[in-house]
Amino acid sequence: MNATSSELLMLNFDVIFIELDPVKRAALLAEYYAEDCLWIHPGGRIVGREGINEAATEIRKHFPEYRYTVTSEIQTMHNVATCRWGSGMPGQPFHYTGTDFLEKRDGHVSRLYTFIDQQLFWS
């Protein structure tokens, strides 16, 4: 699949980061993320699909039923997409909100930057 940067950003919210099964998520990461991908978030830097899968597994342990909702228009420029989002229980107010910037290279996510508005479990 040669997805656009905005499509890859939506896959993060709708599929990858809500997947509870680490094996299924690993397959999704292999399909959509570059091998040397980088995720920078309030807790630090994670390099590679395996590290991102481990971090996503930890997030799902804390918030297994939470879903992500895009709350702004997705803006794109060149191979970068960005948007604001919120996360929480379906039908409830958001527990936390943030902004993501995603960079695409050769059809895959190469970099993901996550800014979170509230302090969570990362210190």
Can you say where each PLM-predicted feature lies in the sequence?
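Short acidic-aromatic low-complexity motifs
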Residues: 2-35
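Short, positively charged
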Residues: 3-5, 76-83
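A solvent-exposed, acidic/Ser-Thr-rich amphipathic alpha-helical stretch
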Residues: 26-79
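Short hydrophobic/aromatic-rich beta-strand segments that constitute the beta-sheet cores
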Residues: 39, 83, 111-112
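Short, surface-exposed coil-to-beta transition loops
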Residues: 67-69, 94-100
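Short glycine/serine/proline-enriched coil/turn segments at secondary-structure junctions
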Residues: 77, 90-94
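Short beta-strand segments that buttress and anchor functional surface loops
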Residues: 83-90
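Short beta-strand edge/turn micro-motifs at domain boundaries
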Residues: 97-123
